Amino acid sequence: MSKGAVGLTAGYWPEDIYRYLAIPGISLDDGLITRPGRRRADHPAVISYQGIFTYRQLAAEMDQTMKAILSFTEGKSARLAIAIQQPLDLVKVIFGAVKGRCSLFLMNPSLPAHELTQQLDQFSPDLVITDDAHFKQEADSLPQRARVIQFQELEGKGTGIPVPRGRQDLQAPAIALALGDGGLVYHSHKSLLAGAVSWSTFVPLKAEDLVLGLQPLYTWEGLYSLFPVLFRGGTCLLASLEDPDRLARAVRNHRPCYSLLPRPEAAKLYRPVYSSVVQAFRQCLQGLFVSVVGPFTAAGRRRLRNLLQKPALLTYGSAESGAVLSSHPTWYLDAAVGIPLTNVDVWPLDPSNGNPLEVPWETIEYAEIGVKSPMTAADYQTPEKREKYIRGGWSRTWIVATMDPNGLFYLQSRIPD
């Protein structure tokens, strides 16, 4: 299928993969838990070292957690800062909070105190929920008025709390993520569901698939490991690289098809301590997606492919835009990062100021990548931040790239911020 036939500028598009796909007008909890659960109630939704939730169980835990959270907020929607390390508990809180129509900020529990202070000041939560005693101690000592509770305090709470009713604004800020420059970016139900639809369409993922999530859920890579496979009614194995032998056993037991790792994390696989993980990946994975934030070498990519004996599939994305460009399992070159994801349009911007150029990629040597898609952030911390990131309706990336006649993009350099 030619790219021209599906709305791109030139070149090739993978067969049987939609270029554009409508995003359902439903909430995140409905699209990822409730609706898949009607079809596959007893199918595993999330697996961790601590246990398994089927879709039926996760739906029940979501409802119970929602009511428990609302019992601490007088039954009203609130702003929640979440710093939970245990994966299954974190999943319960995320979906319980969004179903309760709360806005939440997914935090890194291991943040230094000064960063913790800065981020909590920016988000101004009504309630902080954590399972980390040190984090609670740090948060309690901060000069802010939010109540800090341990996750365990949610147990048994919420009896008699009514479920929120009425029309929900699916484009309002729902989940905040931290940006690299210290600010926050806000995603809506719509933008996060769009990411789930688009990534699961592009890869593609099916209801029979199991995806390995190795990144924390406060990162975009973590969310894109979990949400897309849930949208398809599949399973996510939530693990980490911290215990290589335990991870290797889990991979062999559950046999995931894909995983997504940032480049620095993927580089750890060369260390001798991860030899058992490498062997398990060789036996089970169909490919490893590696997210990059700038230029890379084709030789480095080939080295990783040779290590794993499986495709090293590169992806460029960010907290504000989600996945933007990616290798496809059936279509990639070693020197190219890939093609635009399903539902993603990219346009050349002037690298000197970020303004959209008046000519397409085919007519220029290089330009900054501008992004427009339903996955981009719903809002930023301040109007000044929004003005910095959005130019002429296109999201800036500060990445200079070039496009070849096949529509593949090559990352050239990063513009100093």
Describe every region a protein language model picked out.
Residues 1-53, 57-72, 78, 133, ...:
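N-lobe entry segment of adenylate-forming
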Residues 51-52, 66-111, 213-216:
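Conserved AMP-binding/adenylate-forming
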Residues 54-56, 167-197:
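Conserved AMP-binding A3 loop
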Residues 72, 99-158, 166, 252, ...:
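Structural core segment of the AMP-binding/adenylate-forming
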Residues 189, 306, 318-336, 349-355, ...:
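Active-site loops of AMP-binding adenylate-forming
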Residues 193-210, 218-258, 272:
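Conserved AMP-binding/adenylation subdomain of ANL enzymes
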Residues 257-260, 272-334, 345:
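Gly/Ser/Thr-rich phosphate-binding loop
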Residues 339-343, 354-391, 408, 414:
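Conserved ATP/PPi-binding loop(s) of AMP-dependent carboxylate-activating enzymes
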